[in-house]
């Protein structure tokens, strides 16, 4: 009996030892096949076929990948712009679960055709930079609002300078920077709209003596006048008030206090809770007393 139990245990241990080895081999083979399939699908898009004509994948299941990277560097010196090319060759070899990688670097000057191309790019860039500086300086010199407001208007640029700048820009775009044309056009359009909006806002702030004839929606107007003292151009349903010779104009703004005089007539604006007193010029002996926003007080009426 003991011998039979020992034999069964020995057989069970052998089978358990064989199963992990078989499962490990199966997993290893699956990983290898999966990795090789990924290499066949993705790696060919980043590699170059060798010049000797052999397939990148050899007969023994090896995968060879060669990647060439060229880096061009422009250096400005006393003799002008010099172009240097750095060539990198990366070789990768995969054999089963092992992978070897080699990287070589070769430096040298680029061919004459590439030198001419980069020289043309540098010339166009320098030309557009110089013209851009001239246009900016002329705009700043002719601008009258720049010294006070801190920005220049688009109308201060002359059409000749703008045309010359656009010609160089189109030349540069058409030859080398075609894919940036949409972005530059959008940037120029947004800058123009910004300049126009800033210019439209200046008309409201540069002339404070003419704001009595304009009404802004951000200020609320309170009317506490008696009907016998309203000016002919004052309507309760409108927020704009106009002052004419011989008539007084009253406006109440919350948080805003101003005192303006037009053509010898007084125009007072009072805060809520304060009384405003005015006398009409040319009509002595007829004082007019009016209060704004006083719920517990009445407006006295004087006979004319």
From Swiss-Prot:
Keywords: Phosphoprotein. It comes from the Eukaryota. Residues 195-206, 229-248, 264-292 have a biased composition (Low complexity). Residues 91-101, 208-223, 249-263 have a biased composition (Polar residues). The modification Phosphoserine is found at residues 39, 158. The keyword Phosphoprotein applies. Residues 1-10 have a biased composition (Basic residues). Pfam families: DUF5569. The keyword Phosphoprotein applies. Residues 16-27, 151-160 have a biased composition (Basic and acidic residues). Residues 1-28, 91-115, 138-160, 190-304 are annotated as: Disordered. This is Uncharacterized protein C10orf62 homolog. The lineage of its organism: Eukaryota, Metazoa, Chordata, Craniata, Vertebrata.
